[in-house]
Amino acid sequence: MPTNSIKLLAPDVHRGLAELVAKRLGLQLTSSKLKRDPTGEVSFSIGESVRDQDIFIITQIGSGVVNDRVLELLIMINASKTASARRITAIIPNFPYARQDRKDKSRAPITAKLMADMLTTAGCDHVITMDLHASQIQGFFDVPVDNLYAEPSVVRYIKENVNYMDSIIISPDAGGAKRAATLADRLDLNFALIHKERARANEVSRMVLVGDVTDKICIIVDDMADTCGTLAKAAEILLENRAKSVIAIVTHGVLSGRAIENINNSKLDRVVCTNTVPFEEKIKKCPKLAVIDISSVLAESIRRLHNGESISYLFKNYPL
């Protein structure tokens, strides 16, 4: 049964997405204070009563400070639980440790499962995320998980900002072929595939194009951009095969390491990321970066969850 009131919480840093969501819902972020003492320990307090309230905690987790953001989120969840909130939903658009979803070598942990366990132990009742790197992570939880998709927002962006009828959708690897094919079908476009062989993580040794991109605007789609070395090499391969131009659209712009340098020095015309990850400072250093705002999708998911409505509408449709 829906609760009587919504409370939105966000950490003191990287509140941009949370503020956009709150504005779309016509709400204010609930007063709270998160402090870090000289020893590095974190304390958190909520500035008003949340008893019997429907709590939504919105966090953006990017590169460099992942563990700090995770611990802050766990503390905020637990604080809400001990303050007698009726339901606590963690909105984590970029789910941390999603690439550690399986035991890929001896004595390796499955850290994505550990993340799920910690969230539920802290008191989380529901999780909303976006474009999980591995969809099976939903099965790690003992509470409901809604994995939203950036695809409707991406389709809208392409139709409004790209001459898409003269385009082709590109998958940067075999694993993303289904994503690329689905997007291509929605736009009634062809798609091509780049087969890549990795020498080690984040280092591609060879790339082979499967498909014809002659005189086409190539739109590379992926769930995550990390160091962007793969995207830069993909752009070179596509242009060598007579593509007209190349842009990349990714859900999670982690942009770690030399990502900005790689983008600036690449033959990519544009790299478009959603704001699941905070990268406002990086945009100032890279004129090729652009943003797709997904706050409307998150706001509508909150409204629907609070009112007991289906969220599956958002899997294929942009919020009205």
Swiss-Prot record:
Physiological role: 5-phosphoribose 1-diphosphate synthase involved in nucleotide, histidine, and tryptophan biosynthesis. Active in heteromultimeric complexes with other 5-phosphoribose 1-diphosphate synthases (PRS2, PRS3, PRS4 and PRS5).
MF annotations from Gene Ontology: ATP binding; kinase activity; magnesium ion binding; ribose phosphate diphosphokinase activity
Sequence positions that bind Mg(2+): 131, 133, 142, 146
Provenance organism: Saccharomyces cerevisiae (strain ATCC 204508 / S288c)
GO CC aspect terms: cytoplasm; ribose phosphate diphosphokinase complex
GO BP annotation list: 5-phosphoribose 1-diphosphate biosynthetic process; purine nucleotide biosynthetic process; ribonucleoside monophosphate biosynthetic process
Protein name per its UniProtKB record: Ribose-phosphate pyrophosphokinase 3
EC number: 2.7.6.1
